[in-house]
Each structure stands twice: as C-alpha cells, then as structure tokens.
Amino acid sequence: MDHDERLRLAADLTERLLDRHGAAIVAVGVHGSVARGDDGQESDLDLAVVTTGPEAQVADRSLYLRDPGLVVDLGAIAADAYLEEAGHIGPAWPLAADQYVNHLAVHDPGGFFHKLRHVHEAAVEEAGPEVFAAAAGFDLVQLLSWDATARGAELAGDLLTAQAALKEAAVLAALVVGLHTRTPYRNLSHALHATAATGAAGPAFAEAYRRLLDPTAEPALQVLALGRARDALLTLADREGIPYQAPGLDAFV
C-alpha cells in the first residue's frame, strides 16, 4: 500500500467515524510516518480522533486490516486532554513530540491541529532547562534500574531477561540524550540511530551505545557496553545538573 492509498483509507475511515459520532468528533488527523510523508510499503496508519470530551463513545482501536494488509492504530482523545498533553514536557517527550507537530488533518473544521502545534511549540520554547533536566533525570533513574536488571540476569544466565533489559535501557538512554539536547525523534528507529551518532554525551558514550545496539554482540559484551554508556550519562548528569540521586531518605518525604 502506498502513501496515497493510506490517505484514501484514512478519509474513508474518517467519513465512517463522522457518520457514527457526528459532532462529538472535533478533528481527525493522521500522524506518524504517513503525516511526515516518509512512510514505506510496510508502514502503519496512525490516526488521532479528537473528541469533545470523555462522554464521546469513540474507542481506541489497534487492528490489522486484512485487506489491504495493514495495521491501523486509532487513538481517541478529548480535545482538552490532548492540548494538556501537548503543553507538558515529560520523560517521553523526545518520542511524543512528533505527534503534536506533525499531523495531516483529514477532518479539522476548527483548526484544532494548528492549535495543538502552537501549544506544544510554546511549551518547548517557554520551558526552562530545569524542566528538561527533571524529565531526563527520571529516565536516567529508570535506566539505572534496567542496567541492574541486565547485569543480574546476565550473571544468572537468564539471557531472555537480560536482552529485554538491554533494549529498555537503550531506549531510555535515547530519551535522556533527547531531553538533554531538546531533540525530538520521528520514531524509535530514528531515536536509536540518532543517539548512536551523537556526540552530546561524549565519544565514550557513542562507542558504547553502538556496541549496546549491535545485534551480533554477545550479551555479556552488551551488558558491559551498557555499563560504559551508563557511566558516560552519569558524568553528563553530574556536570549538567540533571537530578537523579538523593543524599538520603529525606528527599522522599
């Protein structure tokens, strides 16, 4: 299925949704690779259905459409909730930001997606360094947890758990770097490749991160690579004031 065929499918689905729900739908837009125009033969169709509120009975759906053989991911969200999300810089921001700024409107009589983009861009512009640092610190703490899981699982010979932990840690490292550099990613693949090429966390990080992602590397070597990438990120955090540690229990009170 090509780009134009996906757009026709989106238009057909939007028409059906409007017939069913009418004025409860504020806007419908395509996001992801189709909205950016870089979709390929196997790309999914991602749709955001914006509603007037939680009372609108539009359900989230992620289904494989047998004909033409394509995954359609439909997410329904109230307009106010979507705008609130767009105005928040959180731990997932590098991967979440694309959907706020890259929408291809299929139905948008009130210009909702323009407003969504404006709200998000204003939030990014107005957010101080401490906002991005706090979000990066949250991800870094999660990375430390997965790093410990990966090391423990590898030592115990539990390679399945070790591999799962390594993958989670790789994504979290990309989020830390993306937040530190204020870099939004198009998708997960872009996040991993961009992080592997970055110099933002120093040359030691980039080399270790590439080894971490190497599918031909032994799990033990990947765990070691994760440790080196972790250390580079901790050095970065200490230098740049990214909060991730507490001197004592009073920090939790």
Identify the residue ranges that each predicted region occupies.
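Conserved NTP/Mg2+-binding pocket subregion across the NTase superfamily
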Residues: R66-G157, F252-V253
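Short N-terminal helix-initiation segments at or just after the protein's N-terminus
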Residues: L9-L18, H107-L116, A246-A251
